[in-house]
């Protein structure tokens, strides 16, 4: 029997249409008899009761806003008649909850690359990273030259990562650029790195070299283009040497406890919080139970669900760090005169998401139910296993880059609308609905839409775990197959 609707939580006073529902259709929702007053698109909400103006709309068991006007049972509930409850900064109280997850330990492994410092990568690639955007053209030619000479064999990829920064920046922007580039140079998915500088930039190559801290000097080389004659020939000579070393690396068995994944959503729809995001949450809990690590970011998309995360913090110090994480981003919004609740995009709204609270309550399901073990500033590298919260905006390119820079081996990216984007680590797209998976097979790597088509979540998660292990062991995802590899760095200040 086809599932036509879903009431996610018994406390909800709206339900979600799983398929397009016509006006006049009669439904029985948990004993509530309803006749729809309007057509309800799939992924959208309809009222289970009459609403008075100002009355809270409940989904996932929490308020997602309030009714802008009186609405009748069976009405379509969307952004035109639901308004956010979010305001400015809030005071929070630590009300810790007990987390008890009965997840068995399994001796699972993947095939990864063990690096000289003991870290593990899931790819063995050669990266060309510029200290400044002025040399973007050069690094592109160098990457193409080495790919042509090697015919793309011997390593997983040879990639140049252009960006616009490294000069004309001050303060936090300059530091953020240095941090993200440092994190890339030190990332274990790179078997070798050539750092290319100009020579006169703010991000001075010699200073940046010191900023890296300890690194493998056999696998990380520098070239300052103002100090060499023919930068192409010089760069190719260095790259040939790096390739000779990296191409000898081999995969070996690595316990799943060493896997680190970033949790991301984008182009969300009304199914995100029902299918793909809960799937990631179940996987995240499983990975953490095996001793692994997951990272949640997109701080503005936590607004409205932040107390759920705060109360899962292992201790009060982490709680205070999470409060700072949330309020720091709210202050960023307010300092620019922007309301903190102005988030859902046109695509979100078309897909059935009406307010930021609704988006947040779906978004935060990606991190499951585990304790919060760490809270990280922007650009910092992972120090703690388990579930970590990371400071970054919701922007796809910036957030995914930040997750990868923290040390995540791959980014798990749920989407209801679809996106081809990939960052500098494998960026796996998980569709929230089967229509998207069918229409965009060149973008979507895994379809979570089957969860509302009567495949149990547990079975879907078992398949998902198997697929994650295959990807960690070398199977390419679509963004890698197509060469969609980009980085974006968070900018908040002036440009000189």
Model features per residue range: what roles?
Residues 1-410, 417-496:
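Metallocofactor- and cofactor-centric catalytic cores in central/energy metabolism, strongly enriched
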């Amino acid at each position: 029997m086809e599932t036509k609707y879903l009431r996610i939580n018994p406390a909800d006073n709206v339900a979600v249409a799983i398929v397009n529902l016509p006006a006049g259709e009669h439904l029985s929702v948990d004993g509530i008899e309803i006749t729809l007053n309007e057509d309800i698109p799939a992924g959208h909400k309809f009222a289970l009761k009459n609403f008075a103006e100002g009355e809270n709309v409940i989904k996932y068991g929490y308020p997602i806003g309030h009714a802008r006007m009186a609405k009748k049972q069976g009405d379509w509930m969307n952004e035109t008649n639901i308004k956010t409850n979010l305001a400015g900064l809030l005071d929070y109280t630590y009300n810790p909850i007990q987390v008890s997850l009965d997840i068995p330990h399994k001796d699972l492994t993947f095939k990864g690359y063990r690096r000289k410092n003991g870290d593990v990568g899931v790819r063995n690639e050669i990266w060309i990273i510029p200290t400044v955007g002025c040399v973007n053209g050069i690094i592109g030619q160098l990457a193409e030259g080495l790919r042509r000479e090697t015919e793309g064999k011997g390593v997983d990829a040879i990639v140049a990562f252009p960006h616009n920064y490294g000069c004309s920046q001050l303060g936090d922007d300059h530091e953020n650029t240095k941090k993200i580039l440092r994190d890339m140079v030190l990332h274990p998915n790179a078997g070798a790195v050539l750092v290319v500088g100009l020579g006169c930039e703010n991000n001075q190559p010699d200073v940046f070299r010191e900023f890296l801290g300890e690194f493998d000097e056999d696998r990380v080389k520098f070239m300052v283009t103002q100090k060499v004659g023919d930068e192409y020939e010089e760069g190719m000579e260095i790259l040939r040497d790096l390739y000779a070393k990296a191409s000898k690396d081999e995969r070996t068995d690595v316990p799943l406890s060493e896997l680190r994944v970033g949790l991301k959503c984008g182009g969300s729809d009304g199914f995100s919080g029902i299918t793909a995001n809960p799937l990631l949450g179940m996987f995240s809990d499983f990975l953490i139970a095996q001793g692994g690590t997951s990272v949640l970011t997109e701080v503005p998309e936590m607004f409205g669900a932040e107390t759920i995360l705060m109360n899962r913090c292992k201790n009060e110090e982490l709680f205070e760090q999470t409060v700072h994480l949330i309020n720091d981003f709210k202050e960023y919004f307010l300092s620019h005169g922007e309301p903190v609740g102005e988030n859902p995009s046109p695509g979100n709204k078309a897909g059935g998401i009406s307010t930021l609270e609704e988006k947040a309550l779906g978004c935060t399901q990606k991190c499951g139910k585990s304790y919060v073990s760490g809270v990280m500033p922007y650009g910092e590298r992972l120090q703690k296993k388990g579930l970590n919260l990371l400071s970054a905006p919701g922007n796809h390119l910036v957030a995914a880059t930040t997750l990868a820079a923290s040390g995540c081996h791959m980014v798990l990216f749920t989407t209801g609308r679809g996106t081809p984007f990939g960052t500098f680590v494998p960026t796996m797209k998980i569709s929230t609905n089967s229509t998207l998976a069918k229409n965009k097979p060149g973008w979507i790597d895994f379809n979570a839409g089957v969860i509302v088509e009567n495949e149990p979540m547990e079975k879907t998660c078992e398949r998902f775990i198997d697929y994650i292990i295959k990807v960690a062991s070398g199977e390419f995802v679509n963004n890698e197959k197509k060469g969609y590899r980009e980085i974006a760095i968070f900018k908040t200040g002036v440009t000189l």
